[in-house]
């Protein structure tokens, strides 16, 4: 997924969504 394009805050929320 794109984890470098998203900011730090978004990255955290994104990782949470990816984990689920």
Swiss-Prot record:
Probably participates in efficiency of electron transfer from plastocyanin to P700 (or cytochrome c553 in algae and cyanobacteria). This plastocyanin-docking protein contributes to the specific association of plastocyanin to PSI. One of its GO terms (cellular component) is chloroplast thylakoid lumen. It comes from Pisum sativum (Garden pea). The gene is PSAF. Its main location: plastid. Belongs to the PsaF family. It is found in: Plastid, Chloroplast thylakoid lumen. It comes from the Eukaryota. Keywords: Chloroplast, Photosynthesis, Photosystem I, Plastid, Thylakoid. Residues 9-20 have a biased composition (Basic and acidic residues). Signal peptide: none annotated. Residues 1-20 are annotated as: Disordered. This is Photosystem I reaction center subunit III. GO terms for biological process: photosynthesis.
């Amino acid at each position: 997924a794109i984890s470098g394009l998203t900011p730090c805050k978004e990255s955290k929320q994104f990782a949470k969504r990816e984990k689920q």
